[in-house]
Amino acid sequence: MGPRILIHADLGRVEWRDSLPSCQRLAELIGWELVIVRRQAGDLMHRWETRWERNVARYATLECVQVILPWSTPSMRFCTSEAKTKVIASALAKRFPGQPILNVTGIRREESATRRAKPVCAIDSNLATGRREALVWNPIIEWPIEQVWRTIAAAGLTHEAYAVYGSTRVSCVFCIMSSIGDLRAAASCPDNHDIYRAMVDLEARSTFAFQGNRWLADTAPHLLDADMRRAVTRARLAAHERMRLEALLPRHLLYVKGWPTTVPSDEDAELLASIRRRVSALLGIDADYLTGPAVRERYRDLIAAKPERIAVP
């Protein structure tokens, strides 16, 4: 039997304040070392903020045709892959070089359709290499939620998210997968008010709701001052207009894997330029390529720069 550790990926401001102490209580109870890892480039809120800044810059230089949202989504969960999975795998690989690793998780089939299909045990693709065997083991995958609650309560390891505030799950305080009830539960905790306001501010600046069509701002509007409520109202209107305008874009003007596939006609280029002018004004983006000829020239330049050249008319 090799060394055993607990490992926790700290997500920073978006995490429940009781999450790290809960891990520490568990480590003390079972007598294992607790290893805490963090994304070196910044916490998850920083990731969303910088993603938005970069997406604005990409739109300004016509590196993308439509404005790209700042948030993670259920189909694009870089929050999990970058802030949890990768940093945990990296820490384990450095700590146990060349040694076999058994990675034990607490996922359960009841949690989602994806997890319902997970095996009890499998090769851990994030850790396994030609020189290292690695398995991921999901020992409680069949457990119903009631058994989870009983086990936690018996160990005296309850978490404030559900014990105090009534959340049905412990994740980021405001998670892209959260129900409206869990979002409200998180907002009822005073510790979460600052991050709530920061996330609503990003909704307002970006014109993208946190969960598709569900605005986080609607969860606890009483926590927002008058200026922020007005900013959210403007953002909703701008979002509706942005989506209406972008729906006018012909599909052949959209990029495929980040690259244009054809140079637009004069008519299409003028249409795209017109949409870019209006969207840029809505979002306050200082964009280039706002005339038809400039758009055509930009497409030509990008096509010329693409590794596999496309015939330019």
Predicted regions and their residues:
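Nucleotide-activated chemistry modules centered on ATP-dependent adenylation/adenylyltransferase
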Residues: 1-313
